[in-house]
C-alpha cells in the first residue's frame, strides 16, 4: 500500500482530538451568576444588565420579575440592580434561573432562541428554532 494513504480511523481520531471542548458540551447557553453584594440595607447586583443581555430580555421586564419574586422594591441604575433589603447570592440566582425557565427557554426543545410576542390580548413565548408557541402571563 502506498504511504500517501492514511487509515480512516486514525484520521478520524486525529480530527476529533483537534476539536475544541465546547463542541462536546450539550449546553451552549449558560446564564452568568449574579455578582451581588450587600451595602447597608440594600443589595446590589453588579452584572444585572449583562445577564439581561445574555438572556435577551429587557432589563426593566427582567427586573420587574425579580422584584416581584423577592417581594421587595428596587430599581435598575446603570448596569446594576439595586434591591431594598438583604439578599444572598443563592436566592438571587434561584430567581434568575426561575425567570429563564419561564420566560426564556423553549418548553419543547429547550433552546434559548425565543421571543415574547403578542397576538390579540395574549402574550406568547415563541421559539425561533422549532416554532413552538406557549402562552405566558406577563408580570
Curated annotation (Swiss-Prot):
GO molecular function terms attached to this record: translation initiation factor activity
InterPro entries: IF2/IF5, TIF2_bsu_arc, Transl_init_fac_IF2/IF5_dom, Transl_init_fac_IF2/IF5_N, Transl_init_fac_IF2/IF5_Zn-bd
UniProt keywords, alphabetically: Initiation factor, Protein biosynthesis
Keyword DNA-binding part of the UniProt annotation: no
Keyword Phosphoprotein in record: no
Signal peptide span: none
UniProt cross-references to Gene3D superfamilies, sorted A to Z: 3.30.30.170
SMART domains: eIF2B_5
A family per Pfam: eIF-5_eIF-2B
Subunit field text: Heterotrimer composed of an alpha, a beta and a gamma chain.
Biological function: eIF-2 functions in the early steps of protein synthesis by forming a ternary complex with GTP and initiator tRNA.
Stated family: Belongs to the eIF-2-beta/eIF-5 family.
Protein name, as recorded: Translation initiation factor 2 subunit beta
Source organism of the structure: Methanococcus aeolicus (strain ATCC BAA-1280 / DSM 17508 / OCM 812 / Nankai-3)
Source lineage: Archaea, Methanobacteriati, Methanobacteriota, Methanomada group, Methanococci
Amino acid at each position: 500500500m502506498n504511504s500517501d494513504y492514511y487509515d480512516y480511523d486514525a484520521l478520524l481520531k486525529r480530527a476529533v482530538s483537534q476539536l475544541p471542548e465546547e463542541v462536546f458540551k450539550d449546553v451552549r447557553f449558560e446564564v452568568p451568576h449574579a455578582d451581588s453584594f450587600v451595602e447597608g440595607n440594600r443589595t446590589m447586583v453588579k452584572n444585572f444588565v449583562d445577564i439581561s443581555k445574555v438572556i435577551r430580555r429587557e432589563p426593566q421586564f427582567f427586573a420587574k420579575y425579580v422584584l416581584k419574586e423577592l417581594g421587595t422594591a428596587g430599581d435598575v441604575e446603570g448596569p446594576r440592580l439595586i434591591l431594598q433589603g438583604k439578599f444572598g447570592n443563592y436566592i438571587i440566582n434561584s430567581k434568575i434561573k426561575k425567570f429563564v425557565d419561564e420566560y426564556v427557554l423553549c418548553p419543547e426543545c429547550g433552546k434559548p432562541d425565543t421571543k415574547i410576542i403578542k397576538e390579540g390580548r395574549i402574550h406568547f413565548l415563541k421559539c425561533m428554532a422549532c416554532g413552538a408557541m406557549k402562552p405566558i402571563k406577563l408580570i
